[in-house]
C-alpha cells in the first residue's frame, strides 16, 4: 500500500480531485500541487466560487438546465424562437451548443440517453415533460441534438416515435458529428456544420 506523502487534508484534497471526470490519481496530485502553490491566486478564489455556487445553483424545472434561477436564463429569454425546441442529453451538450452560437431556441435536457445495458429506460429520462412542452408551447420543430452513439441514436428514434402523434417536425444533427462522438467534445465549427445540415427523422 502506498504511503501518504502529505497530511490528511492534502490527501483528502487529492482524493476529491481524483473523482472528477478524466482525472486519475497522478493528475489529481498535479492539480492539487498547483492549487497549493497558487493558494492566494487560485485556491482561495476557487474555494469561494465553489461555496457560492453550491448555495445558489438550481435545476430549471422547465428544461433541466442548471443555473442560479428557476426558470433558467435561457427559458426566460424572450428573444428565443419558441417554435423550435432543442433536445440534448445533458447540460454539457447544451453548453456546447450555446458556445457554438448557431441556435436561438430553448432547450430540453433529457438527463441522459436510453441505455439498456446500463439500466437506463424511458422512465429514467425527462421524456414526459418533453411531450407536454411540445403540446403546450405549440412547438413546430424538435431538433434532436444527441450524440452519434448507439444509445444516442436509439434515444433519437424513441423520441421520434413518441412525438409522432404530435405532428411536429423532428430533425437530428447530420454531418460533422462523428459516429461514436459526444457533443461536449466537439469544436464550435463542427457543431455549426452539424446544426446547419440537420435532417428529417
From Swiss-Prot:
Task: Write down the Pfam families for this protein, in alphabetical order.
Answer: RecR_C, RecR_HhH, Toprim_4
Where are the annotated coiled coils located?
none
What are its GO biological-process terms? DNA recombination; DNA repair
- Keyword annotations of the record: DNA damage, DNA recombination, DNA repair, Metal-binding, Zinc, Zinc-finger
Every copy of the Toprim domain together lies at: 83-178
Zinc fingers (C4-type) span which residues? Answer: 60-75
Disulfide bond sites: none
Q: Per the record's keyword annotation, is Zinc-finger included, yes or no?
A: yes
Q: Provide the family line.
A: Belongs to the RecR family.
Q: What is this protein called?
A: Recombination protein RecR
Organism of derivation? Xanthobacter autotrophicus (strain ATCC BAA-1158 / Py2)
Amino acid at each position: 500500500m502506498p504511503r501518504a506523502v502529505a497530511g490528511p487534508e492534502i490527501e483528502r484534497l487529492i482524493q476529491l480531485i481524483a473523482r472528477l471526470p478524466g482525472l486519475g490519481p497522478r493528475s489529481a496530485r498535479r492539480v492539487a500541487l498547483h492549487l497549493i502553490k497558487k493558494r492566494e491566486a487560485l485556491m482561495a478564489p476557487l474555494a469561494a466560487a465553489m461555496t457560492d455556487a453550491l448555495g445558489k445553483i438550481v435545476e430549471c424545472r422547465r428544461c433541466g438546465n442548471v443555473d442560479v434561477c428557476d426558470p433558467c436564463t435561457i427559458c426566460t429569454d424572450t428573444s428565443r424562437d419558441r417554435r423550435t425546441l432543442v433536445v440534448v442529453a445533458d447540460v454539457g451538450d447544451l453548453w456546447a451548443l450555446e458556445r457554438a452560437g448557431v441556435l436561438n431556441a430553448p432547450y430540453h435536457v433529457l438527463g441522459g440517453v436510453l441505455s439498456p445495458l446500463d439500466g437506463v429506460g424511458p422512465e429514467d429520462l425527462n421524456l414526459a415533460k418533453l411531450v407536454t412542452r411540445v403540446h403546450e408551447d405549440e412547438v413546430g420543430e424538435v431538433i434532436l441534438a444527441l450524440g452519434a452513439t448507439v444509445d444516442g441514436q436509439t434515444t433519437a428514434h424513441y423520441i421520434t416515435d413518441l412525438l409522432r402523434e404530435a405532428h411536429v417536425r423532428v430533425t437530428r444533427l447530420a454531418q460533422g458529428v462523428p459516429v461514436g462522438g459526444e457533443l461536449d467534445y466537439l469544436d464550435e465549427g463542427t457543431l455549426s456544420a452539424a446544426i446547419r445540415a440537420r435532417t428529417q427523422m
